[in-house]
Amino acid sequence: MFRMIQSLTPSLYDQDTFDTHFLRDMRKARYSIIIESPFIRLARIEQFLPVFKRLTSRDVRIIINTRRPDEHDTRYRTQAIIAIQLLQEIGVEILFTIKHHRKLAIIDREIIYEGSLNILSYYDSCEIMRRITSKAEAEMLIDFIKLNKFMEVK
């Protein structure tokens, strides 16, 4: 009759505090990480690459949804192509969505980060990211962004 409602535990981060918390959560991932970032910058990928390598070696599935490289500005297009190749070489799955502009991450179908910060291209701007721990919210978000079909067990 009564069901326990999982409480949301939100935290807010800015451009100076986001990476520390996000990297900590990623390192603890056991099953999967979804990152939606419309743009990809090579320097930013190089920051995350060691963590991604460790995760994929532990069979943590990483899915990145981004724009196609030809939708990047000319000066970033080549960077995006190189970065995507580096990611694919270590087993990261790349999805492309035309006109993509969402900025979010979902770790182990439970931890959500969402806000204004482009996770894979951030450089120098004023940003905000909210962290929420909720399996129900994560499942709703995965369904909403239509990534359930990519999250099936392989």
Question: Locations of the language-model features?
Answer:
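Primarily the HKD phosphodiesterase
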Residues: 25-88
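Short acidic active-site motifs
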Residues: 21
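Acidic/glycine-enriched edge-of-secondary-structure segments
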Residues: 1-16, 34-40
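A short, polar/proline- and glycine-enriched secondary-structure boundary/capping micro-motif
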Residues: 46, 75-76, 123-127, 150-154
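Conserved beta-strand termini and adjacent loop/short-helix elements that scaffold enzyme active sites
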Residues: 13, 65-67, 97-99
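HKD (HxKxxxxD) catalytic microenvironment of the phospholipase D
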Residues: 33, 92-138
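A conditional alpha-helix N-cap/helix-loop micro-motif detector
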Residues: 14-15, 44-45, 94
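Cysteine/selenocysteine-centered motifs that mediate thiol-based redox chemistry or coordinate metal-sulfur cofactors
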Residues: 139-154
